[in-house]
């Protein structure tokens, strides 16, 4: 089985991408320098499923980008759950904020702009942490949040 075969199989067996996420994907590809960094439909569905299965009350996402994965994870949150997402690039803030508001999940998504290494320590404990920021910073992100920020 090739990767293309696997992707076709997955696409055939998951719910189609909804209009909001399709629009976010399109806008990201039209207006952002590195659109390939978008999590996308398959990854988004996987993240939403994991959140539904684990039922975390608090999620930390490092690396908002344009907000696709944050919306997917927020959709899976239990009642009263919240997602904190950190993005270092303030130029992406407007796109993410607009789609967070349109998603109807704006009251569950808390966006923070700045360095995750600086901001995460003040955000408290989390049940789930999704690291998807600057790949060179992964070891530092992991050290910053893995032992002191997981419940």
Predicted region positions:
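SAM cofactor-binding core of SAM-dependent methyltransferases
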Residues: 40-117
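A short SAM/SAH-binding and catalytic strip from SAM-dependent methyltransferases
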Residues: 128-137
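A short acidic, Gly/Pro-enriched loop at the edge of an enzyme's catalytic core
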Residues: 121-128
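Conserved small/polar residues in nucleotide/adenosyl-binding loops
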Residues: 148-151
């Amino acid at each position: 089985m090739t990767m293309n075969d696997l992707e076709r199989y997955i696409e055939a067996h998951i719910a189609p991408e909804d209009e909001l996420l399709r629009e976010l994907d399109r806008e990201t590809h039209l207006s952002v320098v590195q659109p390939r960094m978008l999590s996308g439909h398959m990854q988004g569905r996987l993240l939403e499923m994991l959140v539904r299965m684990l039922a975390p009350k608090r999620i930390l996402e490092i690396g908002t980008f344009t907000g696709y994965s944050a919306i997917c994870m927020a959709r899976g949150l239990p009642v009263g759950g919240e997602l904190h997402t950190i993005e270092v690039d303030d130029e992406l803030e407007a796109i993410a904020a607009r789609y967070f508001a349109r998603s109807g999940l704006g009251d569950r998504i808390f966006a923070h702009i700045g360095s995750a290494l600086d901001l995460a320590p003040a955000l408290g404990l989390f049940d789930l942490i999704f690291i998807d920021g600057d790949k060179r910073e992964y070891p530092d992100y992991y050290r910053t949040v893995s032992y002191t920020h997981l419940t």
